[in-house]
Amino acid sequence: VYPHQNPGIGPNKYNFDENVRYELHVSLGSDIPLGRPTVTYRFEFQTKFKSQKTLLQSYLGVIQNIDDAAQNLTQTYTITKIDNRLGTTSQIGTGIVPPNNQGNATPFYNEGDNGENPARKGVATAAELDKYTRQAIFTFPNGYTAFAGQRDDGFVGDIQSIFDLLKLRNPGQDAQGGFNLHLMALRVPRSELGGDQQTVGVFATTSRLMMPVSNSNGRGILDLIRRPTWVQVARQGNPLFNE
């Protein structure tokens, strides 16, 4: 979510929205042609401040470990599994969102563990990941692994040529190169999807709480009344084909 995050936005910071349900839907068997979710994995986020008596909203100093005293604004998340075949809901686990890359406040994201250097390049193994990312990969019972946080946008597409120029360029250009996004990743056991060599459908949705406006108090003042009803506001399937 939140693509095209400019790394050089200074003190501004992107966060997950705690008023949004982020859901990953998996369709199996006869649910695939209907686009109907067989199993849904829901991410919900909570935001906490260690201190509200400061102008330094996000960081109070150099962060040595995720969720330490210097990471003032900290987000946690809960992952819930909804099995629509059985009508059951179960909690998979909870995790912590690592800090965004903020230069000197988060030095371990950068080359040589120096916040003034460029960000580390991509790696091939988990052992090569930076310290914050390693700490933010959570393993849960029954074979689940999850991560949620800021990452380099891995989607490659020549957006300008497709939408602006209406023709393909050779060679193409990576329109997302150098920009970040907020990623939610969940590894599930193959047995949960029916084993090896399965055809599955996957799509994602975001939903918000319905928030109607009412001025029934008779004082000419608009009141926001939050109802416990979730409304889907976005759906993402195959990028550039079903969005």
Regions found by a protein language model. Name each.
Residues 1-243:
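Surface-exposed extracytoplasmic segments
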